[in-house]
Amino acid sequence: MPQRRGAPAISTARPPGRADAHACGVPHDRLERLRARTPVAWLDERTAGQPGAWAVLRYSDVRHALTHPEVFAPQMGGPLHGPVTGGEAHGAAHIDMDPPARDMLARIPSGEAVDFVGEVVPELPETLRNTLAGGLYALLRHPGEYARLRERQDDDALIDSAVEEMLRWWTPVLQVWRTVLRATTVGGVPLLPGENVALWLVSANHDGETFPDPGRFAPDRFVQAARPHLCFGFGHRACLGARLARVHLRAMLVALLERPGAPRPAGEPVPLRSSARHGFVHLPVRWSD
């Protein structure tokens, strides 16, 4: 395994790639402690059955990697994930952060329509389910915030902010993988071509340097100018289903706030055991009068 200054190995400890490294809805404090030691750590090949990889934990570094695909290439094939050189994508869909400045569908070459559908549709059911479950769980865990949202349910800016905070706090996709294309340095650690990198979105979204008191669910966090969370990636390779996820989550929130009574836990939730997806196998809920 690599032995490089500034990147202690964590193969002897329980790595954040383990499914049980995340309590329901709140990242394990192991990520916070590890990030305080180093922004980049080495995960050995025993991690979640994956080959060894560098784990990037800090918001600024994760965002940098997401916005430089000419250095950090997605580990996928197909025309929607073609190489990017000189700031221009070849066979890739250019999109802006949601809400888009232009109709992103119109920006996809006609010959790639099938690939667009093939990339987006298979991921929607599971990702949407995890997103909605995570948003609901945030409200179940914070009944006081739910009550305050109900009192101000006509405040569109607050509702929009609450949707973003649900996404940040829960982070339905825990990590994404990249391959280093050319030598670079992240967090003081040299990375070599061909090495794998796990970008921990959940760690970046709970980085206290970017989001004060990151473990707190604060629906008004994004009302004022704030750094965007990284649930959907960043730049022209951001998630193509971002708008759809936001629409569904907002619709669920509005419907819950308009309904008399309030959701309450109806039993212990059973988390999905995955090192990449953040969701539930079961989330029992009852409705109180």
Give names to the regions the model predicted:
Residues 33, 38, 51-53, 168, ...:
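Cytochrome P450 heme-thiolate "Cys pocket" and heme-binding signature region
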Residues 202-224:
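Conserved cytochrome P450 K-helix/beta-meander segment immediately N-terminal to the heme-binding cysteine loop
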